[in-house]
Amino acid sequence: MRLLFGDAAASARRPEEYEARYPRRALPKGAMVTRYAPSPTGFMHIGGIFVSLINKRLSLQSEGVFYLRLEDTDVKRAIPGALDTIVDSLARFDLSPQEGVLRAPAKDGDASSRGEFVQQGSYGPYIQTERVEIYRDYAIDLIRRGFAYPCFCTVEELDAIRQEQMALTVKPGVHGRWAKWRDAPLARVKEALAGGTPFVLRLRAPDDVSGRVEWKDGVKGVISMPVNDLDTILLKSDGIPTYHFAHAIDDHLMRTTHVIRGDEWISSMPLHLQLFRTLGFRPVEYAHVPPIQKLDRVEEVDPETGETKVSDARRKLSKRKDPEANIAYYREIGVPETGTIEYLLNIANSAFEDWRKANPDKPYSAFPLKLNKLAPGGALSDMVKLKSVSQAVVSRMSAEDVYAQGLDWAREHDKELAALMERDPEYTKRALGIERGGKKSNKRITTWPDLRPQLFFFYDELYDRVDALDFPENVPEGDRQPLLRQMLDTFDPADSKEAWFEKIRQIAVASGYAGEVKQYKASPESWKGHVGDVSMLLRVAVCGTRNSPDLTEVMAVLGEPRVRARIARFL
């Protein structure tokens, strides 16, 4: 052993020492310990938020623990700043873990600064490159027990093996007669070491690989696959473990109960279960979630008829081709974080939609998410559904929440609007509070970019920029000034909505407009237009647009001086 690991072999801890160092967690019966274990290799994928959401909800519902572990053993693929993206994205979506890699509070309470990374919890380190000694000690134990061996195959030799296997159409990899160092005599190993030949440590797969391995997946049910027959690499030549080896040790020692991850890992399950048993661990419960997918329009030309056939093909969201794969995209287009979360809950479990309708005032966290109710098939990315959910989420928000979250978005994406919103926060909140609350709450805001068209007329700087006003067609130019003059003369901010509309109706009738829309429709040739046209004339004059909330409430927020000044512009 000393030949392979030097002095480290003598000081290696035994598995029982690690069992004592990382005892079973003192949690209630049925508590789930789950984790999100990303690699720092790029932007935060929507699938990462999806899986984190499921993991955190299930752990909290069961009084368990959700933790973050950084799987950074693939140093070549690591991207600077990726850890910032992971930790900050989880925080933004209220998915921060209870333990693992976290960001410390900002110094001196400065919310604009970001704290340093810390590792919180008793089962760390939570960064794999800081656990190399643990993996090495378990590797030494496997060698002692005859379940691992050093392999000195060069890159050229491995390539030759691959070429031969391709020619024979057999499974590629180190197995069977191609496992050239599996039973190498000690003298040969010493010779390779003396020559300075680098080596990797490989798992010794079972001699009998004719059977199958079967397990019950938490999402997909019972799955059966051939037993793993590859002598998989456990430690690379630099002593860094592979994902397969590290995850088995980490999930056992961190006392993970459920590994919930993307279903691209199903093909590795025979190896992972084999590793757990070889290491002497009880396997965790596995649940594989299908990826969010997208439809691609595919055109194929029939070689016989020459006709073009069009079909839809499913594929998972691509990091390279699909902007919606990046969680930052949802922020950019202005979907509130809760909107994205509720959209993902719809994908996870279709029952959420009916639950939300029955419980409009409850937080999404009250929804009883169940592992065995997760959709086993891949859901399609649906931007129309996303915006529908977003609109519903915003409609349930208080004016204070709309202000806070909308301002947070505007500071990054619409700085002019943000400055106007911040100039008088209470004024802006009153504007946002119009038609908010109740069963017919304002649904004019779907995403945060909608704030500008819904708020611009409350700010003179933006209202004054409107060039072409869309006055109603049924009110000829010659009628505009007289009608607006009468409305200005009779305007009283103390009027109720009903009293003010009655004044407009009387002005309309006296000027040749029908007092009711149905009256106009019954005999359009008898009238210039109807009271709605006259009311719209006032709306356009005051707001600069036909699209605004209740005009009486808008004018109350604008205030009498501003309303009178705007009407007077057209006299």
UniProtKB/Swiss-Prot annotation:
InterPro entries tied to this protein: aa-tRNA-synth_I_cd-bd, aa-tRNA-synth_I_codon-bd_sub2, aa-tRNA-synth_I_CS, aa_tRNA-synth_I_cd-bd_sf, Glu-tRNA-ligase_bac/mito, Glu/Gln-tRNA-synth, Glu/Gln-tRNA-synth_Ib_cat-dom, GluQ/Sye
The EC number on file is 6.1.1.17
Motif 'HIGH' region, per the record, lies over 38-48
Q: Name one GO molecular function term.
A: tRNA binding
What GO biological process, any one, is recorded here? Answer: glutamyl-tRNA aminoacylation
Q: Which Pfam families match?
A: Anticodon_2 (PF19269), tRNA-synt_1c (PF00749)
Q: Tell me where it resides.
A: Cytoplasm
Chain ranges for the short sequence motif 'KMSKS' region as given in the UniProt record: 316-320
Q: What is its EC class? A: ligase
User: Where is it predominantly found?
Assistant: cytoplasm
Q: Which domain of life is it from?
A: Bacteria
* Binding of ATP, residues: 319
Listed under catalytic activity are: tRNA(Glu) + L-glutamate + ATP = L-glutamyl-tRNA(Glu) + AMP + diphosphate
What job does the chain carry out?
Catalyzes the attachment of glutamate to tRNA(Glu) in a two-step reaction: glutamate is first activated by ATP to form Glu-AMP and then transferred to the acceptor end of tRNA(Glu).
| Quaternary structure and partners | Monomer.
* Similarity remark: Belongs to the class-I aminoacyl-tRNA synthetase family. Glutamate--tRNA ligase type 1 subfamily.
Q: How is this protein named in the record? A: Glutamate--tRNA ligase
Which organism's genome codes for this protein? Sorangium cellulosum (strain So ce56) (Polyangium cellulosum (strain So ce56))
Q: What taxonomic classification does the UniProt entry list for its organism?
A: Bacteria, Pseudomonadati, Myxococcota, Polyangia, Polyangiales
Q: Which gene encodes it?
A: gltX
